[in-house]
Amino acid sequence: FALAVHAARRDLPMRRAAERFSGIALVGFTLLTVSGLANGYTRLEAPDQILTTGYGQLLLTKVLLLVGLGALAWIIRTRVISTLGTSSRASVFARIAGLELTVMVIAVALGVALATSAPPRINVEFASFGESLLGFAYPPPPTASGLILGFRLDPLFLVGSLIAASLYCIGYARLRARGDAWPIGRLISWLLGIGVVIWCTNAGISSYSQVSVGLHMLAHMTITMLAPILLVLGAPATLALRALRPATGNERGPREWLTWLLHSWITRIFTNPVYVFIVYVLGLYGLYLTPLFGWLMGSHVGHIGMQMHFLISGYLFYWVVIGIDPRPRPLPYWGRMLLLLLALAVHGIFAVILMMGATPLAPEWYGIVRPPWVTDPLQDSLYGGQVAWGLSEIPTLLVMIVIGVQWSRSDDREAARRDRQADRDGDAELNAYNDRLAQLAERDRSS
């Protein structure tokens, strides 16, 4: 709206403002469209209801309007913004922006109509109270194929993961097109990490984790340890710094803001070893050994928040331990190894507590949504402790190997740097050291 007012007034120095707004609007439009489509999907029982029901027809009309908004925004982005240096083009921008605002008002009105209309999926009959709480029927007894190949859509994590993978691939392609090298191993690591996140949140394990403590712990260990390790080794911030174009003049673009963020006090706090240790490891106790766990499992928003906490806390921890991306205060390698071993010890104690527990974990949730094949809730909690104990060792061993390799390469780089320095100054540092030793020896003889 502000840009439309400036254009109507024919303020000439508005091109840069329009370019900045265009990038922000693109992100907002994408998120709005994806969230709206996902929200509409959950309210339809079958795809054909988008044409056969009043709710579906309203939804379809809103989608078409969003497509129209996207087309208008694309015209402004590709044909108008670059020519905003003249007042005549500013008037064209004002007219198109006014049309865009009109379409947006209609779309908002349709959104209000959708919010006050009853969707087709309003009453779904379930065989038990537990299934009605879940929102889906109990999954069958777990099998390898059911856990790995099963599917239950989680639009938030699926779309977010695909966007993250796409942005990384775009950055990689930009570097390659420019003739710059980027390790293929980092690309593979990032895509594998994204795949693990999608599997944890959209595959069969996501349904089973809501009815079984043991299988929940399997998903927890995977999204907290394996996925962050792979994502961190992808070095997304480093890729972004190399792929993004520097801003012109004194203005800040995405690359400059990212550089500021990586060296800001915010990142300094979130990458502090004490902070990441508390959030990543001790957070286990505050979540699983209190009523908070059962309460979060009983809330859809709470469950999503818990998964986000697992993923983000794991990412921050492994960024400090094995991260390639720059950060304000890198931890020395011996400190990284110590932090990792401390985390392993505290995590092992947590697993022992679960295995020695006399009562099932979160009975206020898992006791209600218990499927027929979970015959012993206490044994199920014991299985969760065994999973936490066993699976924590494999990622930890992998991370220890990575730290060892990084430490060795760091020593090699330091040795090479010293050799180059010696070649430049004739080994002045070593000669000064020998002279100092000779002076000390001469002092000892004279005394």
Please report, for each region that a protein language model flagged, where it lies by residue.
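Alpha-helical membrane segments of multi-pass proteins
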Residues: 1-447
